[in-house]
Design a protein with these regions (language model features):
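Membrane-spanning beta-strands of outer-membrane beta-barrel proteins
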Residues: 49-51, 88-90, 142, 195-197, ...
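Outer membrane beta-barrel
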Residues: 18-39, 43-170, 194, 203-206
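Short aromatic-enriched loop/helix-cap "lid" or pocket-rim segments at secondary-structure transitions
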Residues: 118-121, 177, 225-227
Length: 358
């Protein structure tokens, strides 16, 4: 249970406050301050979770049909002592160029193209979006070192037809297996490393509120990840809790309806050698993921939400009880990694002030 009282949206990203707009140069500021408390039997998920978030978007007109732009977003945890200097994180930081109807190209820390579809169900007041997507897990959420090309309206020829192409450079720590690492790799957990990868997404927006979309990504796994999953000396390589495949893959399909105060969305996704689970370095060989959400926006400000999310791990290795039969023989296991029903509601006092329970 999460309760937020209150949330002050300095300006939501969709309605950012315009700071400057003159001579083809524009700067918008957005952010929020959230007083947030979790109630849980799990001590690690119980208590104060307050935070502040701030960001800006800038754009400059270079020539006709040619612009430069950038965005930065920063999160500051407000639930620790002032002596805690590490409770901050850069969520987004990228810059690029726009070419009118010919699309945009940018590089930096940005959302992955697989998240284009996942974002449709990641709409819950507090929770959600956690069956397989997550920051710094290959190309599933916010990620480092991504070069992204986006085109909305298919070069101005087909309204509603959008697509994106993306490349991600490696982000890995130096290892014991001739892995040189990258400059930003120190301190990364095993599941947060990645090799070079590519992704793509496409969607079509109908004029009555329905959108359909699909996305795919394929990445090299790092030597650290592959070695961990292929050098189990006790039960053999194939039974290690860390997947040992050379590549990590994800694909997803989804749909949403957003019209007449009704919001409905659903997605299905599968991953290979990608999704971390548990408290150690376990990485699932395969996951099957499903999310569905329904919301309604009342005119007086109330927005109730209900959702169902499930991630099933397939062919999981490890030394847990699930991996042994009654005779003590070791085998693969299938189990739910995420499974819950969400019920929540948000109340908007106005566009800049809200409160919610989830």
């Amino acid at each position: 249970l999460a309760m937020l009282v209150p949330a002050l949206l300095v300006a939501g990203a969709a309605n950012a406050a315009e700071v400057y707009n003159k001579d083809g140069n524009k700067l918008d500021l957005y952010g929020k301050v959230a007083g947030l408390h979790y109630f849980s039997d799990d001590a690690s998920s119980d208590g104060d979770m307050s935070y502040a978030r701030i960001g800006f978007k800038g754009e400059t007109q270079i020539a006709d049909q040619f612009t430069g732009y950038g965005q930065w977003e920063f999160n500051i945890g407000a639930n620790g002592p002032e002596s805690d200097k590490g409770n901050t994180a850069t969520r987004l930081a990228f810059a690029g160029f726009g070419f009118g109807q010919n699309g945009t190209f940018d590089y930096g820390r940005n959302y992955s193209v697989v998240y284009d579809v996942e974002a449709w169900t990641d709409m819950l007041p507090e929770f959600g979006g956690d069956t397989y997507a997550g920051a710094d897990n290959f190309m599933n959420g916010r990620a480092n070192s991504v070069a992204t090309y986006r085109n909305n309206g298919f070069f101005g020829q087909v309204d509603g037809l959008n697509f994106a192409l993306q490349y991600q450079g490696n982000n890995e720590k130096s290892g014991l297996f001739d892995q040189e690492g990258s400059g930003n790799g120190n301190g990364r957990k095993l599941a947060k490393e990645n090799g070079d990868g590519y992704g793509m997404s496409t969607s079509y927006d109908f004029d009555f509120g329905l959108s359909l979309g699909a996305a795919y990504s394929n990445s090299d796994r790092t030597d650290n990840q592959v070695h961990k999953g292929t050098h189990n000396t006790r039960y053999g390589d194939r039974f290690d809790a860390t997947a040992g495949g050379e590549t990590a893959e994800a694909w997803t399909v989804g749909a949403k309806y957003d019209a007449n105060n009704v919001y409905l969305a659903a997605m299905y996704a599968e991953t290979r050698n990608m999704t971390g689970y548990g408290d150690a370095d376990a990485i699932a060989n395969k996951t099957q993921n499903f999310e569905v959400v329904a919301q309604y926006q009342f005119d007086f400000g109330l927005r109730p939400s209900i959702a169902y999310l499930q991630s099933k791990g397939k062919d999981l290795g490890g030394l847990n009880g699930d991996n042994f039969d009654s005779q003590g023989n070791h085998h693969y296991a299938n189990k739910d990694l995420v499974k819950y029903v969400e019920v929540g509601a948000t109340y908007y006092f106005n566009k800049n002030m809200s409160t919610y329970v989830d």
